[in-house]
Amino acid sequence: MAGAVRGLSARLREVSGLLAGRFGRPEICVHETDPVRNLVLTILSQNTTDANRDRAYGRLAKRFPTLPALAAAQASELEEAIRVGGLAKAKAKAILGALARIREERGGYSLGFLRGMPLPEAREYLTSFPGVGVKTANILLLFSFGMPAFPVDTHVLRVTKRLGLVPGTSTLAKAALSLEPHVETGDHGPLHLNLSRLGREVCRPRDPRCAECPLLTVCPEGKRRMKAHPAPVRNALPGGLRSVRLEGHATGGPGGVAARGGAQ
């Protein structure tokens, strides 16, 4: 058992290093100013794109500029304001329910008391709210309080399943709780962001770009796919450059400069 634990921790460190080599190491800003607003934003982020989440939050903030105003809103008013983000009825119910309970229990709109709680207790409190699952709670605890929580979204789940880091039957919550203790201290945020980015840009649900993946050397699923469907040779890029794919690497351009899509 101890060997398996060490193995998982070591694999996560290796994965994190490879991702940082491709994407860099994201800086994590902890937004402690208003965790309740961050909770609202995180609920809005469920099952939608970042762009639609931000549009929904912008419309919500414009129509209900303060938390008391938002808490006093009719469900239908809130649904209309956030409709662009999808699942408006469920999200409006979750937001209004959370605000009402926080106001009743704390006498105001503050979650600052979570800062002094152990991570498991803080997560248990947040997930006791209808509409708030482990992913939503972990995002809030990581980015609002700087706790070592590890959010697993659909992209992170897909990547970690293909890497064999979690069982193929894992849910978002089970994967998060399984991986979290083995992530290196200080790496919960950067690893989450880089895995999620990889899932969006490279390790897509369909037609994953395994030949371009920085994790190909440590990914059983990627190796299987590459063996079954070798990457083709490609030529004639714009500007007269050529790119040749060989064993999962892209080279091309003057002097053999690597040409990798998505590297920033």
Predicted regions and their residues:
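Short, contiguous pre-domain boundary segments
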Residues: 1-3
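Catalytic cores of DNA base-excision repair glycosylases
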Residues: 5-228, 238-248
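Generic C-terminal helix-cap and adjacent flexible tail
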Residues: 221-233, 254, 262
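Intrinsic disorder/low-complexity segments
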Residues: 235-263
